[in-house]
Every structure is written in C-alpha cells, then in structure tokens.
Amino acid sequence: MSIGKNVARLRRAKSTRVHIRKLGVPRLSVLRTGRHLYAQIFTADGSKVIAAANTLQSQVKDGLKNGKNSLAATKVGKLIAERAKAVGVDRIAFDRSGYLYHGRIKILADAARDAGLKF
C-alpha cells in the first residue's frame, strides 16, 4: 500500500530538518499552498521565528493578480531576505519542507539569494 503524497513530503521534511539542526544556523522554511506562499526564518534551535513573509501581506500583494505565481514567489523571496538582513541574519539553511526544488520554491530561493542571503 502506498503512502499519501503529503505524508511522504512531511517525512522528507523531517529528515531535512534533522540535518539542518546539526548545522547550527538559522533555517528558512517554506510552505506552499494552492493559493499562497509562506516563508519563515527560524533561530538555529528552531524555537523562535526571526522573520516572516507571505503572499497575504500588503507589501507582496500590491500589484499581484494572485499569490500563486512566480512573480509572487520572487516578491516573497526578496522581502524575506530584506527582513532577515534587518535583524542581522545573512547566512541560513534552506528548508524546502519536502517540496521539490522546482517552480515557486526554486524561484523564492533564487530571489532570496539575489537579495543577499547566503545558503
């Protein structure tokens, strides 16, 4: 019997987070839904959110038709990088939460790199 798509994704995410925690650097975690994209930067131990950005916020929402396209991912990536640098974080580990490194996830990561985050 096969496991569900979301269960498999969560299993991959759990494995990745174990490896990231060993690195001891803040973690950029991404959540993708059908309509929106969310990004959060957690402390090295994972106990606090340092910075967050998503497609529901007015800085990202302005000028967008919807929050599920590549332009929205680019805006979220740039905004999360700006907010991370504002609190003194420039080096992170990218946690794709079990999603394939493709599409909106890849675009968000590239935009964050272009805006100055190192990972």
UniProtKB/Swiss-Prot annotation:
InterPro entries: Ribosomal_uL18_bac-type, Ribosomal_uL18_bac/euk. Part of the 50S ribosomal subunit; part of the 5S rRNA/L5/L18/L25 subcomplex. Contacts the 5S and 23S rRNAs. One of its GO terms (cellular component) is cytosolic large ribosomal subunit. Belongs to the universal ribosomal protein uL18 family. One of its GO terms (biological process) is translation. SUPFAM superfamilies: Translational machinery components. Keywords: Ribonucleoprotein, Ribosomal protein, RNA-binding, rRNA-binding. Disulfide bonds: none annotated. GO terms for molecular function: 5S rRNA binding; structural constituent of ribosome. This is Large ribosomal subunit protein uL18. It comes from Xylella fastidiosa (strain M12). The lineage of its organism: Bacteria, Pseudomonadati, Pseudomonadota, Gammaproteobacteria, Lysobacterales. This is one of the proteins that bind and probably mediate the attachment of the 5S RNA into the large ribosomal subunit, where it forms part of the central protuberance. It comes from the Bacteria. The keyword rRNA-binding applies.
